[in-house]
Amino acid sequence: MLRSVVALLLFATATASVADNPETMAERSQSRAREVLDRAVAANGGAEALRAVKVVRLKLSGKTYPRLQMTTPAAPFEGGSFAETLLVDLEENRLRLEQEFGGFGFDGNNTIAIVDGAGSVYDNRARTITPIPAEQATQQQFIQYHRRLPNLLLRQALNNTNSLRYLGEDQFDGRRHEVVTFVMPDTQQVALYIDAQSGLISKYELIFVDSLTGEEASEIIFGDYQKVGNYQLPRRWQNRLAGEVNADYAAQAEINPAITDDSFRVAAAGYAEVKPVPTNLEEKVEELADGVHVIQNVAGQNQNSLAVGFADYVAVVEAPGSSDGADAVIKRIKELFPGKPIRYVAMTHHHGDHIGGMRSFIAEGATVITTAANRPVIEEMAAAKQNDRLSREPRKPQFLLLENGRRVLEDATRKLELINIGPNPHAREMVIAWLPAEKVVFQGDLFFVPNNDAPFGPPQPSTVSFAKKLRELGLTAERIAAVHGETATIEQFRGATATAD
C-alpha cells in the first residue's frame, strides 16, 4: 500500500511538472545559448575547422594603461609599452611566451617555456632560469591562453556545452549582441558577446574584484577581423577594466604555423639556474626593533605592512591586499600592541595593490596620512559599495596630509618621518617611511629582495631613482624593509644598485 501511495505521488508530481513547465528555465537557457553558439561557430569556419586548430601563434603589441598602476591617480596618464609573442601547441601541450615591456619604473624581458609538463621562466635581464612548479605547468594552466583568441574560446565553449547559458541581448559599440556564458576548465565564467548580424565575438567579460570599487567587469575586445582561410582573426585586441582602457594592442594571429621541437627551446647559455619561487609564503612578524614590526604575508601573499608603536598609539604604513587581509593585519597589530589604538595609517603610493586594505583601517578609526593628490583615491574607495567592515560600520575617512613633502610623527619614545621622494618613475608621488633612530627605511615597489635565491639583476629605473634620493636626503639607512618581499640590508641594496652609480 505504501509503495502504491509513493508511486502515485511521484506520478502526480511529474505530471504537474510536465503540465506547468514542459522545459525548465535552465534547459531553455542552454538551448537558446547553443543556438547562438552554433551561429558563432559557423561564422568562424564551423566546428570541424575550429577543432582542426592544432597550433596558434599570436603577436600582441601596443600600449598599456594598467588601472591603479600608473604614475598618477588621475588623467592625463602615461602609457607603457608591451609586446608579446605566444606560441601554443594544443595537441602536445607545449607553450612558449615571450614578453617585453617598459614603463612605470620597470623594464622586463622574459620568456616562458613549458614542455612535457615541465616549465621555466627565463629572465633575460637578470639572465636567470626559474623552474615553474609542476602544478603550474599542467594542462590546466594552458586554459588561460585559450582566452587570447575568439577561435580558441569557441573551441572551449563547444567542449563545455553543459555550462552554456543564455543571458539575453545587449548593445555594444552601437550594435545588437546576444550574450551567452559558459564555465571554462579553470572555473572562470566567461560571457561572450556575439554580434547579432555577423556572428563574430566582439568581446568577452569576466568579473573581478577591483581594489577601488569592488566587483567590476574585465572586458577583452576583439576587432578589425580579417578572414584567413577558414578563420576570422582579429587584428585589434583591447582590455578594459571597470570601463577604463587597460591595454590597447595590434594583434597578428596565425593558425597552424609550421613548428619543430626547436620552436619551444630557449637559448640561455650563461644563464644561472635558481630555485623555484615559493608558492606559499609564510605568514610572520619580523621585529626590526622594539616596537617596530613588519607584518609579512598576512594581508596576502607577498603583501607587508609596517607597524610602529608609540607611547599611546600605533602608526601603520601601508594597507595592501584586501579588506579581509587588512582585518587579519589589524588583529596581529592588536596582539603586538594590546590596548593601543591604531591612530594613523600611511600609504606609500596610490596603486591598487597598496591600498586594497585601506577600508578596514578607516573602519578601525585610523586617520589616513597621504599626499594631496592621492586623497581623492581614498575618498572614492571609502565611498564604494563593498561587502566588508566599512560597509557594515560606515565612517568617513579622516586625513592628515604631507606638507612640504613631509609629515613627522613623534613623541618621547619614537620618531617616524614620512617623506615624499617623488617624482619617481613608478609614481609621481612616492612616500617612504624613515625611522632615524632605528636606521630603517620602509618602501613600496622601489626595491625587492627575491623570494628565492635569484640574483638582483640590473636595477630597475624606480630603484635607481630611489637610491639617488636616499643619497640626496642623507638617510643613513642600515636596513630597507618592503611592502613586497623580505627586508634588505644596506649592503644588499648597495650591491644591487652599484651598476647604477
What are these regions (language model features)?
Residues 29-35, 42, 115-190, 196-200, ...:
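Flexible, processing/modification-adjacent segments and terminal tails
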